[in-house]
């Protein structure tokens, strides 16, 4: 054959040799079809986008990630690829917390059929800090409803524009029969919910117990 292990795609000649006619009555000639008897077809090369992550910041994601290649032959590498790498998928322009596809495209190679596989962009929720609001109650009464101040909003957002719903909870060190004094309580996320924020950091507030009247 005129092809070798490193020959590129195409059709190659295959010659049959070594045959003889014991009687000497025949002469062997190469068939015309032998000229294209061997076809080298493209190898399959998979190009996979790596995963990426960011924390919600109100800005749209653009661009891509690292690439992983699977299927190169003959010690070849990414430097044989041509074209302009681009990234598509619903990750492009993604803003809100969630998972999105990062899909590579735009590359080619003479001896390969390229298959593009997506990676995942994860936009994580931004963390909010809940600081317990100070409150008071009379001796023997129940604690008032807990409330908290939220900090950590990004991109100029606030409680309303960030779409926060619900209210804070709390765990108090003061019991119903605790004497007059000041006690710490730790706010909790309660029923708070928001698409792009997580309620994960907490600063204690104070409950002041005053004498009963």
Q: Which residue stretches match the model-derived regions?
A:
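Solvent-exposed beta-strand/loop surfaces, strongest in extracytoplasmic domains of secreted
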Residues: 1-213
């Amino acid at each position: 054959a005129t092809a070798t292990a490193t020959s590129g795609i195409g059709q190659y000649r295959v010659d049959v040799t070594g045959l003889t006619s014991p009687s000497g009555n025949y002469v062997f000639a190469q068939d015309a079809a032998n000229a294209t008897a061997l076809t080298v077809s493209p190898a399959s090369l998979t190009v996979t986008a790596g995963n990426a992550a960011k924390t919600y910041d109100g800005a749209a994601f653009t661009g891509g990630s690292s690439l992983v290649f699977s299927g190169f032959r003959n010690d070849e590498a990414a430097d044989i690829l041509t074209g302009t790498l681009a990234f598509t998928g619903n990750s492009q322009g993604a803003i809100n917390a969630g998972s999105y596809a990062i899909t590579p495209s735009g590359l080619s190679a003479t001896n390969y059929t390229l298959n593009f596989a997506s990676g995942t962009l994860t936009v994580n929720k931004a963390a909010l800090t809940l600081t317990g609001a100070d409150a008071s109650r009379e001796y023997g009464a129940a604690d008032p409803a807990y409330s908290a101040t939220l900090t950590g909003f990004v991109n100029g957002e606030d409680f309303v524009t960030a779409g926060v719903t619900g209210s804070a909870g709390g765990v108090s060190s003061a019991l119903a029969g605790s004497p007059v004094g000041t006690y710490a309580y730790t706010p909790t996320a309660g029923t708070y919910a928001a698409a792009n924020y997580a309620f994960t950091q907490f600063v204690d507030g104070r409950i002041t117990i005053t004498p009963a009247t």
